[in-house]
Amino acid sequence: MFTLPPISLYIHIPWCLKKCGYCDFYSYVSKEIIPENKYIEHLLRDFERDLSLINNRNINTIFIGGGTPSLLKNTSIKNLLNGIKKRKIISKNIEISIEANPKTLEYQNFIQYKNSGINRFSLGIQTFNSKMLKKIERTYNSKDAMNAIIESKKISDNINLDLMYGLPGQSLEEALSDLQIAIQCNPSHISWYQLTIEPNTVFYAKKIQTPHQDVVFNMLIEGDKLLKKAGYKKYEISSYSKFNYQCQHNLNYWNFGDYIGIGCGSHGKITQKNGEIIRTIKNKNINDFLSGKYINSVYQVSKRDKIFEYFMNVFRLYKPIFKKHFRENTNIEESFIEKNIQIAIQEGFLINQSDCWHTTKKGKNFLNSLLEIFLK
């Protein structure tokens, strides 16, 4: 029997202090006063509109991302969350996360965020190395980063640090030094991911070079060892947590759960009662969004795209992929992908068992090659 998956809420705040050269996320540099009150008002209207699509499900997690959400006043964040809570569709033990730039944070921010219901803080540190921070065009220094961590830990024990490796000119020793500093700070969660330079970025246009792939691979391998030794469990390709501190919002994405996306440039995935999945794409033009034109497009995901998107997410996790889970979340029988599965097994990417599939070490290391099999 087909059942609707859990559903989350993603809220996009598009403004930033500065557009970093490597960033391909949708954002605006805030050169003028941000129209906070108006934006919050339209976020709530956008939210109201999407509620008609979710079939009375409760929202299990909320993630406020960007951009730089911590640019908004604390009262704006509070008004936003209060407006959402009024609908009374929020799960009792909901995880509410906010992304934050160390440059924009003070102790008072964390207190007021917590009072608003936020119980998880994700700090975009990226690196503690001042030289590297300048290279990747971040707006803060290593002292700002440490201060943000110290202040956040006074308020919450549910702290994520975002760190990148493979930065331009970065050595193995420098990458591991970042990790060692992060581990000493003892956050509950560390996201340790490789910098990739996407085509629509300033770094791509400038032909900025990252370290050789062998050096980057060694960063990953040695970083894995450091994190494991320090008590962090790797549960996803770039995610490591202490016991019981996995990011529930991201886990919902990776388990192919549903999510509403509200805000300028956001997108959503919402499963219908008949098993079909629709995608919502919101307007990227801030002026249009603030005039009530929220939707850019809504479309139904094709059967083949549904399969690819499912595996693109679940293959990131370090756990078995149960065949029952595939059926329940795609409304497709596994016999439809039997040929694809056999090719993946022959290539050494997957192991087949009676009730599940396992990705091999080779499958994780060559994830793109594994995913290409499910495009056919």
UniProtKB/Swiss-Prot annotation:
Transmembrane segments: none annotated. The keyword S-adenosyl-L-methionine applies. It is found in: Cytoplasm. One of its GO terms (biological process) is porphyrin-containing compound biosynthetic process. Keywords: 4Fe-4S, Chaperone, Cytoplasm, Heme, Iron, Iron-sulfur, Metal-binding, S-adenosyl-L-methionine. S-adenosyl-L-methionine 1 binds at Y10, G66, E99. GO terms for molecular function: 4 iron, 4 sulfur cluster binding; coproporphyrinogen oxidase activity; metal ion binding. Residues 1-233 form the Radical SAM core domain. InterPro entries: Aldolase_TIM, Coproporphyrinogen-III_oxidase, Elp3/MiaA/NifB-like_rSAM, HemN_C, HemW-like, rSAM. [4Fe-4S] cluster binds at C16, C20, C23. One of its GO terms (cellular component) is cytoplasm. S-adenosyl-L-methionine 2 binds at G67, T68, Q126, R138, D162. The keyword Glycoprotein does not apply. Its cofactor is [4Fe-4S] cluster. It comes from the Bacteria. Pfam families: HemN_C, Radical_SAM. Might carry two S-adenosyl-L-methionine binding sites with only one binding to the iron-sulfur cluster. Belongs to the anaerobic coproporphyrinogen-III oxidase family. HemW subfamily. Probably acts as a heme chaperone, transferring heme to an unknown acceptor. Binds one molecule of heme per monomer, possibly covalently. Binds 1 [4Fe-4S] cluster. The cluster is coordinated with 3 cysteines and an exchangeable S-adenosyl-L-methionine. This is Heme chaperone HemW. The lineage of its organism: Bacteria, Pseudomonadati, Pseudomonadota, Gammaproteobacteria, Enterobacterales.
